[in-house]
């Protein structure tokens, strides 16, 4: 009589949890951000938004809004709206905030996705047109009075 061998079914390899993150040595924790606002997928090229953003960075909010009101670039209107949103977030944040003391602490402009389109040209050709978008982030700070 032939002996039948019984095999045990193979177990699937169990996944291990990743090792815990190492604590950073001698580095303070990142400070909590102040009042901030962000704008995603702005349909203006980042290069053009940065021209306006460089003028506004570091200014008091009231002065920045006044300047943006009379700036002819297409990015000025959305940036002014973003600043007003950040001021509203500062007022809504719970603590008493002096709106006159707020200034633009950080203002970053990053590139968003490009929308690729084609423009018909002569003799059956087509040129690619890239419609660029921007992501804008603004954080406000309070000027220390002294």
From Swiss-Prot:
Which GO BP annotation is one of this protein's? translation
**GO cellular component annotations of the record:** cytosolic large ribosomal subunit
Claim: Thylakoid is one of the keywords in the record: no
Give yes or no: UniProt keyword rRNA-binding.
yes
A single MF term (Gene Ontology):
rRNA binding
Annotated region Disordered: the residues are 1-39
**Keywords of this entry:** Ribonucleoprotein, Ribosomal protein, RNA-binding, rRNA-binding
Quaternary arrangement and interactors, per the entry? Part of the 50S ribosomal subunit.
Which PANTHER family does UniProt cross-reference here?
CHLOROPLAST 50S RIBOSOMAL PROTEIN L22-RELATED, LARGE RIBOSOMAL SUBUNIT PROTEIN UL22M
Family label: Belongs to the universal ribosomal protein uL22 family.
Function summary: This protein binds specifically to 23S rRNA; its binding is stimulated by other ribosomal proteins, e.g. L4, L17, and L20. It is important during the early stages of 50S assembly. It makes multiple contacts with different domains of the 23S rRNA in the assembled 50S subunit and ribosome. The globular domain of the protein is located near the polypeptide exit tunnel on the outside of the subunit, while an extended beta-hairpin is found that lines the wall of the exit tunnel in the center of the 70S ribosome.
**Per its record, how is this protein called by name?**
Large ribosomal subunit protein uL22
Q: Please tell me the species this chain comes from.
A: Anaeromyxobacter dehalogenans (strain 2CP-C)
Q: What is the lineage of its organism?
A: Bacteria, Pseudomonadati, Myxococcota, Myxococcia, Myxococcales
Gene name of the record: rplV
